[in-house]
Amino acid sequence: MLFFYIRHGDPIYTPDSLTPQGELQAAALAKRLALYGIDRIYVSSSVRAQQTAAPTAKLLGLEPETLDWATEHLTWKDFALKSPDHKKEHWVFQSAYFIRRFNSPEIRALGANWTSAPEFADTRFAEGIARIQKETDAFFASLGYVRDPVSGTYRVERPSGERIAFFAHQGFGLAFLSCILNDPYPHFCTHFDFGHSSMTVIEFREYDRENVDPVCVPRVLQFSNDSHLYREGLPTKFENRIFF
């Protein structure tokens, strides 16, 4: 199974929608995904994600399935906080204070148990990660891939050659992919990021299926790929901040 995680196009947050640039990005992305096809489309309930998915769905004749648990505002409640360097609530992965704390020896040493740190006792980190992990596990189990909570590998109950596209967000995506890849959130959210309309491709490949004890591990084949923008002559400007 190939899993495509796609961040929405260039957004207007209020009212929730895409900019004209975001609409062009979504159209370019649809052409890229149509090249080899997509079998199913899942999408956050936010308008900007829905509008990003729409051109792909139309081009391929697919009906997207909306997943309310992937909407950004739920993740914001769990992972946006005030800190000494921000008077207003802010994503923790964009806060110098939390970036330092997340990468401290104490937090790194806790690994998957990082939410047990006393300094996070008054946050919603534990609830947020537990919620997203539960929904993520249920989602992939519905596709035939069941996660082992100890090893982070997957048992394949129904082998699939499907190509699955999931259109959602940056903040949600950092928590979501950390759950898929068994990489603690403090490390993942401070070392990886998604551009507008970017495509991350993960292969759920099963190894040694003919043997008694096969294993499936999700492997990232591409991360935050925006080649569709280059192909269509659109600006490849990450977060409207830097060209590369």
Spans of features found by a protein language model:
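Active-site-proximal alpha-helix that buttresses catalytic centers in soluble enzyme cores
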Residues: 1-71
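Beta-strand elements within well-structured catalytic alpha/beta cores of enzymes
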Residues: 2-6, 42, 159-168, 172
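Active-site metal-binding loops of divalent metal-dependent hydrolases
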Residues: 9, 170, 224-226
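Aromatic-acidic/polar surface patches that form glycan- and anion
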Residues: 18, 42-45, 125, 129, ...
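A structural signal for well-ordered alpha-helical segments within the folded catalytic domains
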Residues: 27, 47-51, 130, 134, ...
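Non-transmembrane alpha-helical segments in soluble domains
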Residues: 30, 57, 133, 137-140, ...
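Phosphate-handling substructures
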Residues: 61-145
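Acidic, low-complexity terminal tails and accessory targeting/binding regions
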Residues: 73-93, 146, 150-163, 174-244
